[in-house]
Amino acid sequence: MKVLAVEPPSGELVQGLRSLDDGYIPPVFEKWGGYDLLDGKRIVRPRESIEYARRLADECGIFAGLSAGAALAGAIRVAEQLSDGETATIVFIVSDAGWKYLSTGAWTDDLDEAAANAESIIYF
């Protein structure tokens, strides 16, 4: 088993996520082993987070938030990096809901516009 963190680039915001490099260490992360638990990290930009949150809703009927979109983007990236013939069971956690973002344009604006707005809006 491997455990990978998904986070935005240092200094950027993905709502619901912060870069570990920016100094915020979630208490639950420390409680269960912190950096010793991680086998690696995947960096996900705000645009990808919105894009994959939209895909969760459109393709799977899961109305999740932007951090869940980031988690899906990271999981897909891991799957794409598997060698030919290599198999894996990849699990990601949907940790928030889309209702918090209804008034922000994350679901209705053009993707590029929503991504630009996401970098300057604090959703909650």
Segment roles from a protein language model:
Residues 69, 96-98:
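Short glycine-rich anion-binding loops that position phosphate/pyrophosphate groups of nucleotides
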